[in-house]
Amino acid sequence: EIKQKTWEKRTAVKQEASFKLKVAEEDKDLESMLKFAARTAILTRDMKEDAQAVITALGLPIVQAPSEGEAQTAHMVKNGDAYASVSQDYDNLIFGCPVLVRNLSIEGRRKKTGTLAFQKVNPEVIMLQDVLTNLKLDVEQLIVLAILVGTDYNPGGVKGIGPKTGLKLLKEHGHDFEAIFTK
């Protein structure tokens, strides 16, 4: 149900971008056309099949996750079937993935959100145990922190609670999560 709402929201964003793209085309506003065209991009079945064919031709395995890709890759890394999960967000850590690689890019850059500009990025290896040690949390508390500040599945998190406040609440209440959410 939560994932369905996420898909619906993404579809609505694409539809709005499609409308704005048409307006930009009518106005001959090239910058807006580029911006909104990028937001209307979709991954087609043919594109997926072509990518899978290339991966198979390279002799690499393809794993189709039964549910969430982040959960699948976290499971594979925990079982030693892969070294790390590669993602731009931190959701893999919430699933207990021991090693996460961010900013893995051939060109060493990625698009800045909401702009046509790019920023230089370097690959970053994040070890779950280091995150937990630095924050003085366990995985269960990290999950609660993610719920408080927001994830892909609850964008924005709990209104008025950012990372600092969320961490402070966890330090104050430990594992008394009911106290955190009723406060």
List where the protein language model places each region.
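Acidic, PIN/NYN-like endoribonuclease modules and their adjacent C-terminal/linker elements
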Residues: 98-134
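Non-catalytic nucleic-acid-binding/docking modules located in mid-to-C-terminal regions
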Residues: 119-183
